[in-house]
């Protein structure tokens, strides 16, 4: 019996929604010197990019770039709008929603975590029911990961 050799020549390409491989032309562009992020060239480039990126997102509204991962954005959303002891309503829709739950708990936010099926989105009827049950209006926010490319919702 021959032993299989799993080593393949060339470069491996990761074929999942993210993180993604960096194309060669982008890697080559990184060979150029950086520009001063406080200088006029950077300001001009930034404004041009922000204006043109509207075409990609098919919007006429301003596009805001948040310099962090999605996890960083979740953390920022929690710490900039809530305090320890605040109550939130959160829904399980997949792996990322459970990570957001963990972040909330680390900030001592009280989480009403509604377990769910990773193959479906949040049921708006359950959101409505939970908010109606909150007679004292303790729920300060509703948190839901509503788009996971991994499970196609």
Language model: regions and residue ranges:
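PLP-dependent aminotransferase-class I/II
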Residues: 108-140, 144-147
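Conserved small/polar residues in nucleotide/adenosyl-binding loops
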Residues: 152-153
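Structural motif
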Residues: 12-14, 62-65, 86-89, 111-112, ...
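Active-site-proximal loop->helix
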Residues: 99-110
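Short glycine-rich anion-binding loops that position phosphate/pyrophosphate groups of nucleotides
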Residues: 70-71, 147-149
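Conserved beta-loop-alpha segment that forms the PLP phosphate-binding cup at the N-terminus of a helix
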Residues: 60-89, 93, 97-101
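Basic/polar N-terminal segments that are highly enriched at the extreme N-terminus
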Residues: 1-9
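A glycine-/small-polar-enriched, mobile loop at the entrance of the PLP active site in fold-type I
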Residues: 11-67, 71
């Amino acid at each position: 019996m021959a032993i299989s050799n799993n080593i393949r020549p060339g470069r491996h390409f990761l074929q999942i929604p993210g993180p993604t491989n960096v194309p060669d032309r982008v890697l080559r562009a990184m060979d150029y010197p950086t520009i001063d992020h406080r200088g006029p060239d950077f300001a001009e480039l930034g404004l041009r990019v922000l204006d043109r990126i509207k075409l990609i997102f098919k919007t006429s509204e301003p596009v805001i770039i948040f310099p962090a991962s999605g996890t960083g954005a979740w953390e920022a959303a929690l710490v900039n709008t809530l305090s320890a002891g605040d109550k939130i309503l959160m829904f399980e829709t997949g792996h990322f929603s459970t990570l957001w739950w963990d972040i909330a708990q680390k900030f001592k936010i009280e989480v009403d975590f509604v377990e769910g099926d990773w193959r479906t989105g949040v049921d708006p009827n359950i959101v409505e029911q939970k908010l109606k049950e909150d007679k004292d209006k303790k729920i300060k926010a509703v948190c839901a990961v509503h788009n996971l490319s991994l499970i196609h919702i």
